[in-house]
């Protein structure tokens, strides 16, 4: 898993793009140039309410004050955003910057790491322009530590993009989820994940990934998945109550093996997120102390209770399931994907009723970057209130990314990551899909004609 010359070349490509005329803009806020953002409304995340009007005072990359009115220092630039709602930048806790729509296996086999890295920079920009100022990239899917180059280019101001937590490749067992198991063995097709078959190998892999720049760990805990109805594997349910459908996603690591990974990540000052669709893998993950259970299609009563007690968020990723159902290659595949979505919705409602903590993660990449605000709409459609979904995005998302004291609120001392949307998102959650203004770290990246700069 050594950093290859291809990855080093990708770093150079990203740097070149960042310095190209017309590509970069000023990406460092001037602390001597205060900015006051003014809008008709402001979303107070902690209180879970809209206040009117709304103002945010920004100096440098940080918020100085926020509320219905703030001090206007001498010489401050006032940006009047009119009939909009000021909100913290959105957080997507599950993205894939190195993927785009189309067959994933073909991307990882046919596209070079430099090509995928360039595409990842474009994906990062699209996500930022959609209002996502912080993201957790859940694996490069075969591009190794190339995400380190993208993160450093963003942090260095070379290219626009969200604040990132990155994992490099995810970790999986030999022959497990994301391994190249459908190819002619003579072709020696590389896995999209890094192999680790026991606790010792998990720890070793985490250390090597950390050396190459990863800032959290992703582990595949379950897969592949199957949905069974009427005792007929592979036959999608077409009627009846999902309560009686049989979903199966075998675990890959024991609780002890996962715990070894969690302990090593903790020693390094980071955490572990798991791809987990079913039981008993979800219980093993919760017992091991992971930071999140992503997809979380099936959770037992015991697992849900443990997640509540330890405040381990589930990350449902509805948008990718809906996208696959709507873009299936055949009628049979569409029926299967719609059945999977129906089962997932049924289980999600159980989880919400049980009080399982939620975070917002879309799994964007296989569907177009910059469109993932749809995830918040779907979580509302399937059972949560707009306030609950927004607080899940901001508070639990910030917790997962371990930036809970820096992002997710319009509060003094937090990063000046601010967006504005038309209307009131508590009345209509789809407003988050119409972001009109984006500021990250005190720098304005997007401003549509909704107000005036003074």
Regions found by a protein language model. Name each.
Residues 121-145, 161-170, 214-224, 271, ...:
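Divalent metal-dependent hydrolysis catalytic cores, especially in the metallo-beta-lactamase
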Residues 26-33, 42, 47-87:
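Histidine-rich, glycine-flanked metal-binding segment
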Residues 102-104, 147, 228-230, 282-289, ...:
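Histidine/acidic-residue-rich catalytic or RNA/ligand-binding cores of hydrolases
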Residues 7-19:
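Bacterial N-terminal signal peptides
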Residues 267-271, 340-425:
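His/Asp/Glu-enriched, well-ordered alpha-helical/loop segment
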Residues 149, 200-314, 338-357:
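Histidine/acidic residue-rich metal-binding segments in metalloenzymes
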Residues 85-158, 174-177, 182, 288:
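Metal-associated gating/positioning segment near the N- to mid-region
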Residues 98-116, 174-190, 225-251, 310-341:
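Active-site gating loops and adjacent loop-to-helix segments of metal-dependent hydrolytic enzymes
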